[in-house]
Amino acid sequence: MIHLLPVAFAALLITTTAGAGDLILTEAGELPVILTAPHGGAEDVPDCAARTPAGKRFVNRPDQRTDLLARGIADELKQLTGKAPYLVMARFHRKFIDANRRADEAYGAPGCAAVYDAYHAAIRRYITEIRSKYPQAMLFDIHGQAAHPDSILRGTHHGTAVARLLARAGATAITGPDSVFGRFAASGYRIVPLNDTVPTDRVEARGYTGGYTVALYGSNHDDGIDAMQLEFGLELRARDVIAQTARDTAQAIAAFYTRYLK
């Protein structure tokens, strides 16, 4: 889809929610799939001071073009399946709010709270809606990383966030041919960890095992769903390949949906 990037930019400009949600793009879907993207935004947050380091791992740069990647995956999924996924995407800059952290680590001023709360309220609302409609569901948290620039990294907190999926379908749902990472590997992508390991073997890359979103909404919680963090290398988000990355990711998710969520 050569038109992917222009369509994505247009959607980011015109499709928003109200109030604090003006800084959050939300779209209800028809698939039992939620795409979240907390780190791709570029907008300032009124009355919210920029974050400052507090002695912990601190990043205030956006995950470049992950907003466009998430948008592209959603559009491609609609093309493939005839149904749209749910989408929650930050438009606010990470230097103000890191929505993939607990509230006490995510921002540094009271004026930021409304936007942070609205982002997570949207995710929770969609999870509640999906759980009322479908027996199984999956959340994919979209991120970017530079440590493995040509690779896609899996983060499930070593299987904890996909506990329900593992219990009903086994490790092949994470590493098998119709798993998302099985499809990535078959398409020629480098993946970390490799699919010759068991998800509970604690082999996910240090620092990329899954953040707050996956930990909070994963299926190890009674009110959660299966959740996985997808970390896309910088090279896979380059302007000349991001459309293909989105297409291949949507195809992988569609295959997973057909096998494990229908």
Language-model-detected regions and their locations in the chain:
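N-terminal signal peptide c-region/cleavage motif recognized by signal peptidases
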Residues: 15-17
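N-terminal catalytic or cofactor-binding beta/alpha core of small enzyme domains
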Residues: 19-262
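Alpha-helical transmembrane-bundle signature of multi-pass membrane transport and export proteins
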Residues: 11-13
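Sec-dependent signal peptide recognition
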Residues: 1-8
